[in-house]
Design a protein with these regions (language model features):
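Short, well-structured N-terminal submotif of metal-dependent ribonuclease cores
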Residues: 1-64
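Structured helix-beta-strand junction loops
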Residues: 31-32, 91, 144
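Acidic, PIN/NYN-like endoribonuclease modules and their adjacent C-terminal/linker elements
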Residues: 2-4, 123-152
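Alpha-helix N-cap and coil->helix boundary residues
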Residues: 20-24, 40, 97-101, 117, ...
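Helix-adjacent hinge/juxtasegments
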Residues: 55-83
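Histidine- and aromatic-rich ligand-binding microenvironments
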Residues: 6-8, 14, 37, 98, ...
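Active-site neighborhoods of divalent-metal-dependent phosphate/nucleic-acid chemistry enzymes
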Residues: 83-132
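Alpha-helix capping/helix-boundary segments
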Residues: 11-12, 41, 102, 121-122, ...
Length: 152
């Protein structure tokens, strides 16, 4: 059976923006493992990529400016961002899992591992699906004893 690796937001964004660690991200994404991610990672990635694209193309300075721009113009101008993310998921055969929804478990993970809610949600989803490996550049996941981190 193939290894299952959870792909975190940092790997996706680094790869699509061709950042300094994009080579490692490419190795992870092209490995023979079964790569999975979750809806929260999709959402985070879309937001980070839209921000980077908006800064470069439209001079957007921060989250508030991005929200204002989208409120006025919609998502049409960000279609290249959506297409890039969807293309990576499709071509990379990345399975998008539904996040585990349990507030008491979420709070427990947040407290035990000192994580922000989104990171705790990712860890909880990994635990719920029995995923032991996470590809990430976020060192906070090193504190999670049931996950083996790749990349940090």
């Amino acid at each position: 059976m193939k290894d299952v690796v959870f792909i975190d937001t940092s790997i996706i964004v680094e790869y699509l923006l061709n950042g300094p660690k994009a080579d490692f991200a490419e190795i992870v994404l092209s490995a023979s493992s079964t790569n999975v991610t979750s809806t929260i990672v999709y959402r985070e990635s879309l937001g980070a990529l839209a921000m980077a694209f908006g800064r470069e193309k439209f001079g957007i300075k921060g989250k508030h400016s991005l929200r204002k721009f989208i409120r006025k113009n919609g998502w049409a101008k960000f279609e290249p961002v959506v297409e890039a993310l969807d293309g990576l998921i499709r071509e990379g055969d990345i399975v998008v899992l539904q996040d585990f929804q349990g507030t008491s478990e979420l709070k427990s993970i947040m407290k035990k591992y000192r994580l922000m809610p989104s990171d705790a949600q990712i860890a909880l989803t990994c635990r719920n699906y029995s995923i032991e490996k996470i590809a990430t550049f976020d060192s906070d996941f090193k504190r999670v004893d049931f996950l083996k981190t790749m990349g940090v």
